[in-house]
Amino acid sequence: MLRAALTIVFLFAGFATCHAGDAKKGEDVAIEHCRRCHVIPGQNNMGIGISPSIKAMIQSKATDWRHKFEVFYALRPHPSFVIIREFRTRPEFPLGITPVIIAVDDLDHLMAYVDLLAQELRK
């Protein structure tokens, strides 16, 4: 219930769209947390299963590709293992999945990194 409420607040209050992040710190966040499932340009060549690469998501023809990055923590499967530190949301973890615990600032840094990659990849 709390997770759903936070998701709604973040989505409709514009939380995810006010970026003042550091792209290098965002790359570090992606390397630490995202590459276990997704391919990060210049970092790893393999992700898991059907997890799309960061490059493929950025180069997507979908018009909402950036919004999906902004709210990734609310999109499946992320709510089952991503915790926003400041809000201490604690999802029910499936067996064998280590939680990803990130700070609100990490979200801004991650978006700065995505925006930097997009400048190159979406030319």
What are these regions (language model features)?
Residues E27, G42-F72:
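Gly/Gly-Pro-rich "capping" loops immediately C-terminal to redox-active cysteine motifs
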